[in-house]
């Protein structure tokens, strides 16, 4: 077992975006380099792209500051959005009825890994 750490992660918890919408954005950047992923997310029209970009940038910063990895060689090896707690609210409807609204939240996790310059 070597002590050579080549990956770092970041997690944003309780993000107020539904997991299904967050996964749609995460699928755009999984397997890409960090620089490429951030440029894709910058111009993605989905609202979930902003919190995902923050997590990607945080994972890259963690890799650089905590483990001394070169940010230009980082690739997103894992990215997923798990379901967080759901807030339940009621929408008043006609004739005294009420419909339930589920305000979903996500836990977004990104793992970046250092790749060799020639590999890809």
Swiss-Prot record:
Domain of life: Bacteria
GO CC, any one term: cytosolic large ribosomal subunit
Transmembrane segments: none
GO molecular function: rRNA binding; structural constituent of ribosome
One Pfam family linked to the record: Ribosomal_L22
CDD domains, alphabetized: Ribosomal_L22
Alphabetized InterPro entries for the sequence: Ribosomal_uL22 (IPR001063), Ribosomal_uL22_bac/chlpt-type (IPR005727), Ribosomal_uL22_bac/org-type (IPR047867), Ribosomal_uL22_CS (IPR018260), Ribosomal_uL22_sf (IPR036394)
Signal sequence residues: none
Keywords: Ribonucleoprotein, Ribosomal protein, RNA-binding, rRNA-binding
GO biological process, one term: translation
Assembly and oligomerization: Part of the 50S ribosomal subunit.
HAMAP family according to UniProt: Ribosomal_uL22_B
Family: Belongs to the universal ribosomal protein uL22 family.
Primary role: This protein binds specifically to 23S rRNA; its binding is stimulated by other ribosomal proteins, e.g. L4, L17, and L20. It is important during the early stages of 50S assembly. It makes multiple contacts with different domains of the 23S rRNA in the assembled 50S subunit and ribosome.
Protein name per its UniProtKB record: Large ribosomal subunit protein uL22
């Amino acid at each position: 077992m070597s002590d050579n750490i080549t990956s770092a992660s970041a997690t944003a918890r309780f993000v107020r975006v539904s997991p299904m919408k967050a996964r749609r954005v995460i699928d755009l950047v999984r397997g890409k380099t960090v620089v490429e992923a951030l440029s894709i997310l910058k111009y993605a029209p989905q609202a979930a792209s902003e919190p995902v970009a923050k997590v990607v940038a945080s994972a890259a910063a963690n890799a650089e500051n905590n483990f001394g990895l070169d940010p230009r060689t980082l690739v997103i090896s894992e990215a997923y959005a798990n379901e967080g707690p759901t807030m339940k609210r009621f929408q008043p409807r006609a004739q005294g009825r009420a419909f339930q609204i589920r305000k979903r939240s996500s836990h977004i996790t990104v793992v970046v890994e250092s790749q060799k310059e020639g590999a890809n």
